[in-house]
Amino acid sequence: QIFIPLTVGGAINTLEDFDRVLKAGADKVSVNSGAIKDPGLIGAAAKKYGDQCVVLSMDVARVDGKYHLFTKGGREDTGLDALEWAVRGEAGGAGEIVLNSIDTDGVKRGFDLEMLEALSKRVSLPIIASGGAGKMEDFKTLFTLPGVDAGLAASIFHFGEVDIGNLKRYLTENGVPVRL
């Protein structure tokens, strides 16, 4: 028997949406656009289910030298300062943050370390980095950054560019503690 926490996101706009996915078996709920539309949703969900259940998902890109928060899968600039939004999310009850850098997503040249560092200086929540992994070394570099707790990648695994087992062994050999 193995425990793998399941986080579900997408079209989470109300407490009823939280109810629906949690009753279906999710352990955590990731919310982005719904929280932007209704910032009180984060606090209401944290109060009802606990902050460990609420994941603030952020799609962020640089606009005129500032970090802007995007919605609708990264297609619409909200004009909100992403770092300020993260601080509000933490104060509102989010338990962790997934930061997807639109600037590096799919580019496969490494995670957006500058953006992650800026975020980690503003919040004390666990941060999960997303967007940019292209090789095993990118994960090693990521995990040397203080304040980053996890890394998320998709395409490098889907297309067989990096094998998960090999990545875990590589990280272990390079002093990054992972479960083998």
Each predicted region: which residue ranges?
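C-terminal helical cap(s) of enzyme catalytic domains, especially alpha/beta-barrels
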Residues: 42-49, 141-180
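Generic structural signal for well-ordered alpha-helices
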Residues: 18, 39-43, 83-87, 113-117, ...
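Catalytic cores of alpha/beta
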Residues: 6-7, 12-25, 114-151
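Non-catalytic interaction surface on structured domains
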Residues: 1-5, 16, 88-89, 95, ...
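Short secondary-structure boundary/capping elements
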Residues: 10-13, 37, 77-81, 108-111, ...
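Conserved anion-binding
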Residues: 22, 26-99, 103-104
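Alpha-helix-loop-beta-strand connector modules within alpha/beta enzyme cores
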Residues: 1-7, 43-59, 108-135, 175-176
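Short beta->alpha connector loops at strand-helix junctions that form conserved
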Residues: 10, 31-34, 154
